[in-house]
């Protein structure tokens, strides 16, 4: 392919023309060609829909390509994943059949997503990427490592297991990458990370990326990194494109409040967070009973079920996903424009990662927090720590705050080509039998189903949700509060914030 026309033959996706915020537009004007990348890598980058580097990519990619250790801090949804995948792919030698990059992430869903980004960007390089996580077949992973693997993406426990068995040879691996480094160096994972590093050569290169860097990261940096280049693009913690509201609601009125939000908001896709796995399952069932499409996911589900839910939600087969904090880390689904905290989080870190599931890559998003009176202390604390303002929910929410005029331009996520096979053992609390949750299949039939195109294109989700008739006796009466008809009808479904509870949705008064 000649020097002049190689770009003309690229299979480019539909251009994302939605407006973006300064979180990704405040760049120095560099292009990906300025980094002297391999042409095959540039082809993968452009065919994935990347047009120009974001600020974190401008800062980190040149330093990583120069061989420096990098400690980078940037907001959720600003392009951190490509910031370490692009230099990793540039440095890999496809003819050398050894693991040349290890990418560690805290959750299994994020491992699946990251591995697919590696495959998508590196599809013209002849690079083999393997994903390995807990909850999947160890035997299959061992067999897979008999074949060439250049990039290994996984969760810490499984990677340590494979390294300790001398199945995954990291002795000549030159590149160590940690995404969501603050979580990876928490008490939960830090000991495992220290053990994994013992299998690496001493002259390795380390790349650490996160939105927050607590003291644990500082101590790890002093011990294991070699004069790292530090990047901090966190002039403020929250994304500029996300509008945040709260509503004080009694616990028994939360479901009715959620129902009203569904009927009033123009939701493309939403993620609804709860603080416990039990509440995740119960809420998902209630939402399904109200007639809305809904899946759920939490850590106690079988891995195969989690993979299936994650894959179908990414592909736009369902509009709403109820989950625990399992999906607060790194999950990138551009179509999500609304995040609802059904249970208000206790820490600023959790809040920051939850709302960061909307407003991805400088686009618009909406975060709504349903709060009990006891949550007011957490609200004040989070506002102070993040330096942000969470406003009372207004009578009407301007759709321009969270809905782009050209929603058809939303890019489809990188399709996960094949999901790992789950363990044979099935958790007794699987919780995916009820109507609305996808059935989980196994073997070749399951793998083939993942390769079929979505039966419900993502664009179909852009119509407002239409609730079915509510169950008899729903919503419950407001104890001690004026009847619904005493609220002014012009409130448009959103009562003033001083009211505990929402006025009934149309047809339910």
From Swiss-Prot:
It is found in: Cytoplasm, P-body. A motif (Q motif) lies at residues 30-58. CDD domains: DEADc_DDX6, SF2_C_DEAD. It is an enzyme of class 3 (hydrolase). Residues 441-493 have a biased composition (Low complexity). The keyword Transmembrane helix does not apply. A motif (DEAD box) lies at residues 179-182. One of its GO terms (molecular function) is RNA helicase activity. GO terms for biological process: cellular response to glucose starvation; cellular response to nitrogen starvation; deadenylation-dependent decapping of nuclear-transcribed mRNA; invasive filamentous growth; mRNA processing; mRNA transport; negative regulation of translational elongation; P-body assembly. Its EC number is 3.6.4.13. Residues 241-401 form the Helicase C-terminal domain. Disulfide bonds: none annotated. Residues 61-231 form the Helicase ATP-binding domain. The Q motif is unique to and characteristic of the DEAD box family of RNA helicases and controls ATP binding and hydrolysis. ATP-dependent RNA helicase involved in mRNA turnover, and more specifically in mRNA decapping by activating the decapping enzyme DCP1. Is involved in G1/S DNA-damage checkpoint recovery, probably through the regulation of the translational status of a subset of mRNAs. May also have a role in translation and mRNA nuclear export. PANTHER family: DEAD-BOX ATP-DEPENDENT RNA HELICASE 50. This is ATP-dependent RNA helicase DHH1. It comes from Scheffersomyces stipitis (strain ATCC 58785 / CBS 6054 / NBRC 10063 / NRRL Y-11545). The lineage of its organism: Eukaryota, Fungi, Dikarya, Ascomycota, Saccharomycotina.
């Amino acid at each position: 392919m000649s020097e002049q026309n190689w770009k003309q033959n690229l299979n480019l996706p539909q251009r994302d023309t939605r407006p973006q915020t300064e979180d990704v537009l405040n760049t120095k004007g560099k292009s990906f060609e300025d980094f002297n990348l391999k042409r095959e890598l540039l082809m993968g980058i452009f065919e994935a829909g990347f047009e120009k580097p974001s600020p974190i990519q401008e800062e980190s990619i040149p330093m990583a390509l120069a061989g420096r250790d990098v400690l980078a801090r940037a907001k959720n949804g600003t392009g951190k994943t490509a910031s370490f995948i692009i230099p990793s792919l540039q440095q890999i030698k496809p003819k050398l059949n050894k693991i040349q990059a290890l990418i560690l992430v805290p959750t299994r869903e994020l491992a699946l997503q990251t591995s697919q980004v590696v495959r998508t960007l590196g599809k013209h390089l002849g690079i083999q990427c393997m994903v390995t996580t807990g909850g999947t077949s160890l035997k299959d992973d061992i067999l897979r490592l008999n074949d060439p693997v250049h990039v290994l993406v996984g969760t810490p426990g499984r990677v340590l297991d494979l390294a300790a068995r001398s199945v995954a040879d990291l002795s000549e691996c030159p590149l160590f990458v940690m995404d969501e480094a603050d979580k990876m160096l928490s008490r939960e994972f830090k000991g495992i990370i220290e053990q994994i590093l013992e299998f690496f050569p001493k002259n390795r290169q380390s790349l650490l990326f996160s939105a927050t860097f607590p003291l644990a990261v500082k101590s790890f940096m002093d011990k294991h990194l070699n004069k790292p280049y530090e990047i901090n693009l966190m002039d403020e913690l929250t994304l500029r494109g996300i509008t945040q509201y709260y509503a004080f609601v009694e616990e028994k009125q939360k479901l009715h409040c959620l129902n009203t939000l569904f009927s009033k908001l123009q939701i493309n896709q939403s993620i609804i967070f709860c603080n416990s796995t039990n509440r995740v399952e119960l809420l998902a069932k209630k939402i399904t009973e109200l007639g809305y499409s809904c899946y759920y996911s939490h850590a106690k589900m079988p891995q195969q079920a989690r993979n299936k839910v994650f894959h179908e939600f990414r592909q736009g087969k369902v509009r709403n996903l109820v989950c625990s904090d399992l999906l607060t880390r790194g999950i990138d689904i551009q179509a999500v424009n609304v995040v609802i905290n059904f249970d208000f989080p206790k820490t600023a870190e959790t809040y920051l990662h939850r709302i960061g599931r909307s407003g991805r890559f400088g686009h618009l998003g909406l975060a709504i927090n349903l709060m009990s009176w006891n949550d007011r202390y957490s609200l004040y604390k989070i506002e102070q720590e993040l330096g942000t303002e969470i406003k009372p929910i207004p009578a009407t929410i301007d759709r321009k705050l969270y809905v782009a005029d050209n929603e058809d331009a939303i890019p489809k996520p990188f399709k996960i080509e094949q999901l790992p096979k789950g363990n044979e053992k099935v958790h007794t609390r699987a919780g995916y039998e009820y109507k609305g949750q996808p059935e989980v299949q196994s073997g070749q039939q399951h793998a083939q189903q993942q390769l079929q195109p979505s039966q419900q294109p993502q664009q179909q989700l852009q119509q407002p949700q239409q609730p079915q008739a509510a169950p008899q006796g729903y919503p419950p009466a407001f104890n001690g509060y004026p009847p619904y008809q005493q609220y002014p009808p012009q409130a448009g479904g959103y009562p003033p914030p001083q009211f505990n509870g929402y006025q009934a949705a149309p047809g339910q008064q």
